[in-house]
């Protein structure tokens, strides 16, 4: 079955079928006829031929830091929902938080035939920024804010402030488990939000009460052990991610601490782990799936329109979710 046979069965010209296949103008009446013939015959247009005609591959590269992350899976689900409906196929590139792998895949997608790239970023180095300056493929950053580039990012500072404002109502001695400050969003912004609220409430956050973890359950467990061995009187523990907070809860329970009576614990991210740990984890909900959808929509605009401003940015909202791991007043 070829395009000429489809045209003959539909009673239209070959050019009309070609326009239909390439999203050109075709009257609604003829669209219905052509669609019906294609469905009945099971015709599949040659992707190679379409690519030669349109110079489009309908492929999008998605660079992600960690394939087993609940946050990333929600973002990718949102990306996929939008792009697959528009006929795009995704190529997922898992970097395991390696800068070298990220740069490798950015180069690979730039030099090979993808129509666009979504880069789920954690740490943006000088090398990343230098490459992005010369990037000739439409690209959207997801998860980090970079001035002058299309990006979707969370309001991490506000999220941390809003959460801490709830916890200071019943907490006096605070500990915090962060991640590397090379991560602008999760590392710096969230810690800054916590510190700002504590300062306003005249609560000291001793620098020794801030421990640096690495996004994992194990690091949450280990850093909580370090923290409470040094400061056993901490009554409020905030973690930069839910995963680390669940690790913290595990250590506290194992060592006889009553949650939330002795120690209230909170994370950020509203992951499934926080909903199954006992007590359920107080957290901040980020709209990760929605942010994935917004990134996909923005990329489609960049790929399909010549009039999209390159500085388009979207800062996502968030909401505090109070559960059983915090003390009620």
Describe every region a protein language model picked out.
Residues 40-46, 100, 120-122, 221, ...:
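Short gly/ser/thr-rich secondary-structure transition/capping motifs
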Residues 1-58:
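N-terminal helix-turn-helix DNA-binding module of bacterial transcription factors
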Residues 84-130:
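Central regulatory/effector-binding core of bacterial HTH transcription factors
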Residues 14-16, 52-68, 166, 173-181:
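Short beta-strand segments enriched in small/hydrophobic residues
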Residues 40, 81-86, 134-141, 145-329:
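Bacterial carbohydrate/catabolite-sensing allosteric modules
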Residues 49, 103-106, 129, 164, ...:
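Short hydrophobic/charged patches on amphipathic alpha-helices used for structural packing
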Residues 39-77, 86-88, 96-98, 108-111:
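N-terminal helix-turn-helix/winged-helix DNA-binding helices
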């Amino acid at each position: 079955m070829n395009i000429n046979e489809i045209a003959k069965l539909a009673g239209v010209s070959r050019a009309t079928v070609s326009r239909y296949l390439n999203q050109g103008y075709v009257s609604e009446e003829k669209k219905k006829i052509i669609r019906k013939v294609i469905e009945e015959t099971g015709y599949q247009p040659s992707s190679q031929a379409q690519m030669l005609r349109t110079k489009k591959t309908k492929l999008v590269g998605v660079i992600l830091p960690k394939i087993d992350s609940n946050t990333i899976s929600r973002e990718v689900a949102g990306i996929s929902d939008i792009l697959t409906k528009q006929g795009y196929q995704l190529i997922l590139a898992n970097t395991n938080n390696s800068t070298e792998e990220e740069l490798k895949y950015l180069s690979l997608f730039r030099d090979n035939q993808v129509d666009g790239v979504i880069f789920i970023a954690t740490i943006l180095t000088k090398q990343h920024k230098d490459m992005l300056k010369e990037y000739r493929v439409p690209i959207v950053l997801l998860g980090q804010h970079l001035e002058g580039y299309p990006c979707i990012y969370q309001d991490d500072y506000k999220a941390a402030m809003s959460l801490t404002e709830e916890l200071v109502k019943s907490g006096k001695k605070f500990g915090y488990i962060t991640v590397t400050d090379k991560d602008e969003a999760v590392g710096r912004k969230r810690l800054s939000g916590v510190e700002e609220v504590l300062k306003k409430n005249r609560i000291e956050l001793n620098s020794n009460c801030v421990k640096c973890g690495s996004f994992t359950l194990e690091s949450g467990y280990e850093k909580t052990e370090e923290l409470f061995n040094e400061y056993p009187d901490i009554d409020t523990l905030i973690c930069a991610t839910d995963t680390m907070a669940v690790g913290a809860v595990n250590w506290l329970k194992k060592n006889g601490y009553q949650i939330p009576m002795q120690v209230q614990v909170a994370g950020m991210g509203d992951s499934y782990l926080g909903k199954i740990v006992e007590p359920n984890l107080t957290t901040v909900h980020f709209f990760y799936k929605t942010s994935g959808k917004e990134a996909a929509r923005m990329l489609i605009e960049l790929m399909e329109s010549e009039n999209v401003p390159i500085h388009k940015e979207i800062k996502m909202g968030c909401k505090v979710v109070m559960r059983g791991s915090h003390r009620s007043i």
